């Protein structure tokens, strides 16, 4: 079931829910439902959007995810994480991040340096330094975090170290539901369009029966119907993708709507909240700054 208000949507990828995520018992650890909440494109010092979305995290329990561009530019060079630390950083002990291009030295699109500041700031929560891909369990869900900065991790094709790791990880998974997170979307109606470099990851997840993919990069909110890696509708087996680059940085505008796009907004900061059940999930976009936009619904796992 899907409830959607307003023609376009701006969304922040928000995911909360974390029993046992960090090596110790989490509050609410006995509940059957887990919360996962978050977004991407977060800390931009000239914007107050990140402060507004951080307030949404303040009132939402569970695990926090990010989908890249955590340090989204404009911080002092000697303190690249300073704007993030003052708002979303208040939740760092329950945050599992992935990196984006702005988290790498040199900024957007850079392949001139590593993400030392990113790995130093998030520590073990970001996975092995230099790799940035890892997985964890959240209730009845298997959560996979990937690094879509392909040039920095030895590629993203089927023969790359990350894809070989992903295939092993999925083969060993015994959870009934799977959600994956990374920065660059394979499907998007935003200005940066589709990133074919992540096709192999989508294909591996699809073949393994994954349920949800969450991305950022485009500073918009968009939700797609379940589909195949080729973009064909697949209501019973396809992966539902969310683009939630609404964490606080200045927002983008949409281009032409892509096939299977079901909800879009480019005017609202916010976070995306998942309620993860053992056999399914609910999603709800939480708008910041008093916006009336909303998008919510539910689905079963495959």
What residue ranges belong to the model's regions?
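N-terminal active-site segment of His-dependent metallophosphoesterases
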Residues: 28-82, 159-160, 168, 188-189
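Short, solvent-exposed aromatic-acidic interface loops
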Residues: 283-293
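Extended active-site neighborhood of metal-dependent phosphoesterases/phosphodiesterases
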Residues: 58, 76-178, 193, 197-207, ...
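Cleavable N-terminal signal peptides
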Residues: 16, 26-28
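Bacterial N-terminal signal peptides
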Residues: 10-20
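Active-site glycine-centered loops adjacent to acidic/histidine catalytic or metal-binding residues
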Residues: 41, 68-69, 100-101, 146, ...
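Residue-level marker for buried hydrophobic side chains located in beta-strands
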Residues: 36-38, 64-66, 97-98, 180, ...
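Bacterial N-terminal signal peptides that target proteins for export
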Residues: 2-11
